[in-house]
């Protein structure tokens, strides 16, 4: 297989927008699939991931309210991962969740996959979740304009994180997600 183009520029703390741009790039490049956008969270919105650039120290986890990556065939694209921005799924899982499910239950991840084509049409973020009450940014925003859904919606992010909303796939635990990744193209 020929070498794939480099990842698109990414903005720290805006993983959902990074994933949108990366999914768009890989779809347009015609990379073999499946191509999915994967949301990682849990009902407590306290999900521990290791090997993340935002970690307080190397080897320590960062606790995200949510994280978003892109699956391309058997690879995971995660520009926040210190082990590599594009890794085989098993390597990304080992780096990001080195303790498996042997952590406090409140930090256990849940995963929901969205087909990239669907995600690219309906995702939108006006970045309101990244602003303080006075309107200032919690973290510097990306240079690109906010993403607007094809239907003109400006903020659909909450629906992607809702554990009560029916999505294209159910929220699943680490083992089920790893099993789905182990058989690219058959799930």
Per-region residue spans from a language model:
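A structural boundary/capping signal
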Residues: 1-187
